[in-house]
C-alpha cells in the first residue's frame, strides 16, 4: 500500500531554511572580500582631544530648473525652496538650542548661499560664516552602477576637488579647538557643531568617505531638498552617521529632489 503524504507539507518543508543554509548564506554575505577594516588614523591627526565634532550637512532648498547653456551656479531657490530652507532653519534651531555653532560653511553656488542666508537669518544670526568653492556641486568618482553617464573629463576634474572638500571639512577637533571650548562656559557635552550647506552629490560622497565605505556607491543614496544629515567624529577617530537626509520637518507637499 502506498503511504498518503501531504504535498503541501513537502513543499513547505522544502522552503524552510535549515541551519546549514543559514551558515552558507552567512559565509556568502560575510566573506573576507566583503569585510572592511577601519582606519583609525584616517584624518592623519594624532592630537589628543576630548571634543566630539558634530557636522550638520544640509542640502540646499529646491532650485529653479537647470537650462541648457546656463551656469549651474547661478540657479536660485524657488518660493518652495525658500520655504523649505526656513523650515530647516527652524529645525536646526530646535536641535541646537543652547549650543553654540562654531561655524557655518556654504558652497559658492547661489542656491546653497541663499539657503545658508535663510538658516542664519532664522536660527543663527551671529554665526561665523565662510564660503568655499570646494563645496560646489560636481561629479564624484564614477558611480557603480554608472547610470549618470557623465564624461570622464567631468569626473577627472570634479573628483579631486570633492576629495579636497572632504579633507577640509572632516577631521577630528584640534587641541586648539579643545582649548577654545574650555573657555566657553555655555558649551555642553564637549561638542563642536558645524553646519555645512551644500549639494546632494557632495553630501552623498562625504557620508561614504566618512564611513570608509566604497565611494562609488554615492548614486545609490537619495536626499530630499533641505534635508539634514548629522555626522559625528569622536576623539578616537570613530565616525557615526546619526541621521541621513532627514526631512521630517518638511510637510509631504514640500518634499522635492531637484
Model region roles, listed by residue range:
Residues 109-113, 200-201, 225:
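Alpha-helix N-cap/helix-start capping motif
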Residues 64-65, 70-76, 118-185, 189:
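Phosphate-handling substructures
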Residues 58, 198, 223:
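A conserved hydrophobic position in a structured secondary element of the catalytic/binding core
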Residues 118, 205, 209:
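Active-site signature of alpha/beta-hydrolase-fold catalytic machinery across serine-
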Residues 2-131, 151:
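Active-site-proximal alpha-helix that buttresses catalytic centers in soluble enzyme cores
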Residues 55, 102, 188-201:
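Generic beta-sheet signal
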Residues 1-54, 125, 135-153, 183-185, ...:
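Acidic, low-complexity terminal tails and accessory targeting/binding regions
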Residues 61, 200, 247:
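Active-site metal-binding loops of divalent metal-dependent hydrolases
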Amino acid at each position: 500500500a502506498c503511504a498518503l503524504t501531504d504535498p503541501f507539507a513537502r513543499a513547505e518543508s522544502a522552503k524552510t531554511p535549515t541551519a546549514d543554509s543559514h551558515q552558507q548564506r552567512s559565509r556568502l554575505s560575510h566573506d573576507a572580500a566583503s569585510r572592511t577594516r577601519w582606519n583609525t588614523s584616517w584624518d592623519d591627526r594624532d592630537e589628543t582631544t576630548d571634543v566630539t565634532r558634530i557636522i550638520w550637512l544640509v542640502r540646499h532648498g529646491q532650485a529653479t530648473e537647470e537650462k541648457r547653456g546656463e551656469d549651474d551656479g547661478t540657479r536660485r531657490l524657488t518660493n518652495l525652496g525658500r520655504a523649505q530652507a526656513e523650515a530647516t532653519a527652524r529645525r536646526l534651531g530646535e536641535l541646537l538650542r543652547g549650543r553654540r555653532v562654531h561655524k557655518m560653511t556654504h558652497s559658492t553656488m547661489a542656491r546653497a548661499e541663499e539657503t545658508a542666508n535663510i538658516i542664519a537669518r532664522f536660527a543663527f544670526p551671529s554665526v561665523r560664516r565662510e564660503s568655499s568653492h570646494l563645496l560646489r556641486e560636481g561629479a564624484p568618482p564614477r558611480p557603480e552602477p554608472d547610470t549618470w553617464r557623465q564624461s570622464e573629463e567631468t569626473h577627472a576634474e570634479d573628483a579631486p576637488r570633492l576629495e579636497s572638500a572632504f579633507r577640509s571639512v572632516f577631521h577630528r577637533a584640534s587641541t586648539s579647538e579643545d582649548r577654545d571650548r574650555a573657555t566657553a562656559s555655555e558649551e555642553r557635552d564637549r561638542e563642536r557643531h558645524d553646519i555645512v550647506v551644500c549639494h546632494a552629490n557632495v553630501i552623498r560622497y562625504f557620508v561614504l568617505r566618512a564611513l570608509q565605505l566604497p565611494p562609488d556607491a554615492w548614486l545609490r543614496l537619495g536626499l530630499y531638498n533641505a534635508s539634514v544629515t548629522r555626522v559625528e567624529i569622536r576623539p578616537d577617530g570613530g565616525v557615526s552617521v546619526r541621521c541621513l537626509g532627514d526631512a521630517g520637518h518638511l510637510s509631504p507637499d514640500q518634499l522635492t529632489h531637484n
